[in-house]
């Protein structure tokens, strides 16, 4: 019959690395940190949503967060999303974009992010969003 195989299946080294990664995630409480910092970010982003009409939605779980950027008529604002993404990069904060119309800002920081880093991210994003009012 057909033999099933996997490149990494059963490799002692791969298994050892996987075990160590899981141990670090547990020992450093990275899941708890993702929830705590993620909740903080989502709360802060929802505050920004209340101040900027072009934020249509904030959604996510843990540290996987999306911010929908829209036009006044509710349609996808692809160009504005690209502008925000590039301005954040100019400020040395790497974020991405996604979605069928590429109008969702994607925030996926490392599991080790601290609250101080999240505060800086929100402050920088707020400044960039204020600048959008001049850009449009």
Feature locations, PLM:
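Conserved N-terminal phosphate-binding loop of PLP-dependent enzymes in the Aspartate aminotransferase
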Residues: 1-136
